[in-house]
Amino acid sequence: DGGAYGSYGVASLYYTGALQTVTYDVPTYRFRGARAFTNKPPGGPKRGHGTTQPRFAVEVHLDKIAEELQLDPAELRLRHLVKPNAVTANWLQLGTVGLAACIEKVVEGSRWKERFRKLPYGRGLGLACSSYITGAGLPIYWNDMPHSGAQIKCDRGGGVTIFCGSTDIGQGSESVLA
């Protein structure tokens, strides 16, 4: 649903398909999508930009698989994570992937092994993952232009200033650059 105008509907749909391969190892992949014009306001890039709804569907499906097979959902995810420096089925070049360490830290900090499937009726403990490819690697929009850049200015007093086109909208880009 891209709304009544062209806007970013096609780009969001592109991200929906392109970025589903960057969390879990998917050796073969096919995506078909359609962008529909509706009488709603135009959609555009906000947090997640085309990835949140399909990622939610994948994560719910993984939970259903784990439940049916009586597997630990955290271990199922860890077993199928994409590896660092991998090239995905749709030719996205990945660099560092810190998701395994993140899951392990969450499992430890939440006392997952002690509490999962052991809480009273109406209480639960869950886990879901997502990834987003950023920075280096192949650009999402294929062209020969640089797809990210920054300038660093060092002054005589030891100060450092970073100039870049990054806008922090809750995704932590200012913290990363600091």
Q: How would you describe each model-predicted region?
A:
Residues L92, F116-G122:
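Short coil/turn segments at secondary-structure boundaries
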Residues P45-K113:
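N-terminal leader/propeptide and maturation segments of large enzyme subunits in energy/redox metabolism
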Residues D1-P54, P120-A178:
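Gly/Pro-rich active-site capping loops and adjacent beta-alpha segments
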